[in-house]
Swiss-Prot record:
The protein, known as: Methyl-coenzyme M reductase II operon protein D
GO biological process: methanogenesis
Keyword tRNA processing set for record: no
Keyword vocabulary terms for this entry: Methanogenesis
Lineage, opening ranks: Archaea, Methanobacteriati, Methanobacteriota, Methanomada group, Methanobacteria
Organism: Methanothermus fervidus (strain ATCC 43054 / DSM 2088 / JCM 10308 / V24 S)
Superkingdom as given in the UniProt entry: Archaea
Database matches in InterPro entries: Me_CoM_Rdtase_D (IPR003901)
Subunit and interaction comment: MCR is composed of three subunits: alpha, beta, and gamma. The function of protein D is not known.
Gene: mrtD
Amino acid sequence: MEKMEKVEFIDVKVVPYRLLNPQTVETILNKIYDLDGIVRVLVHGPSIPKEIPYGPAKGIKVNHKDRQVIKVKGEEVELKVKVGEIIVGVLCDDKMDENIGKIEKIMDENLPCSYQMWVGTYTKRDVTVTDWMKYGPKFEKKLDPRYIGLVDPNSKVKENVKLIK
């Protein structure tokens, strides 16, 4: 098996004490993507379904005010979660500490509540059997390394991952 180019980065995990509204998420993501050395950004939180998935009301549309389309660097991104956690991948280079400080400043200026921030490894870095199941054999040459660890093998990538350049 041939090795794909490895991207060395560290994760900065930000957990606000409250779930964030779409406008706050849009502002924060745009400011983070303005920084140099950002590899990827993941948002995580409770799902906001389009329809009720099970039970007696199964199939009925859910009209949730926070399931919105936001613009991040000119790209439209549909928020499918109520954001409660942001993980930012920062390149391990000479600007890493500076970028971590800038991320902290962005959070201080834009979050309406207190938060906790940790630096460490919170996402997968290496190809696993799950990735092989999802993408098939010999995918290493074709796959952007930023996809590693982002998608459940049973989900559709384009429904759950949005690459912002």
